[in-house]
Amino acid sequence: YGEDFIGIAIHTGGRADPLTCTDYAWKATDYRSRPSLDMNRNLLLGYFKAQTEFEEERSKGADMDVEVSAVWDKEKNNITVTPRVTFCVNRDESPYGFAYVLTEDSMSNPNWVQYNNYSGSTDDRGITKEFDYFIDASRDILNLENNFVAIAAEGVKAPLTGYIKTPIKADEPQSHTYIFKNISNKKIIQDKSKLKVCVLLINKTTGRIENAAKCTISEPNTTAISSLSQGEGQVVETARYTLDGRRITTPQKGVNIVKYSDGRVSKEVVTQ
């Protein structure tokens, strides 16, 4: 699902787990069983796959677009994060708060051991090819690659508020900055080039993640935004959707809904 999917793997095993993220410890206490899997903090999922649930959730769309950019300082010790939220509807109130999560992909170590309780569970074979790997693997798995690993976080237990100004006006972007500080102190990090920043927009009334975005981290003096590149004074496309509300990154055959940086929204017929 590419950039449509934002995964965060939270390890809370303490000293027994080298990937433990202490910043997530208080939020992790909301979930008593391990492992557990949920979507948008409001839908508990099964352990094996959730394609149907994901596609249904994606098709619903959201009341706002969320984009994010991130850049290192020269010492690669601090990361400046700039979320950009554009609402599709007017609202008088703002029950929203932000959470910021730093993740790393492709983490592994020959000394790490993953205990595999599904080893030999042949009755479950065929659910997914990924799950078949664990069925065929030994009880103790070495050299397992860990992705989406939470490294640092803020606002995951109590979302940070005060950044969305009211009344909210449709098609008027709102942005602010947040800084991940002293990243070099996170000894868990293996490869800074594999880090990504996730921004979660959370409804404080419901506890639900309303929308989110992720991005890589640019080098100093450059800018890379998750889905927007815009020159000053230049009208550019900022978002594209299918008729059923699903956000897409490239034109797809049929009718596309296109939003532009000057606030215009138009229908575009793509024939090939």
Regions found by a protein language model. Give the residues of each.
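Short polybasic amphipathic segments
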Residues: S36-N40, R240, N256
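Residue-level detector of functionally pivotal "anchor" positions at catalytic/ligand-binding pockets or at interdomain
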Residues: K214-R246
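C-terminal tail/sorting-segment detector
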Residues: V255-Q272
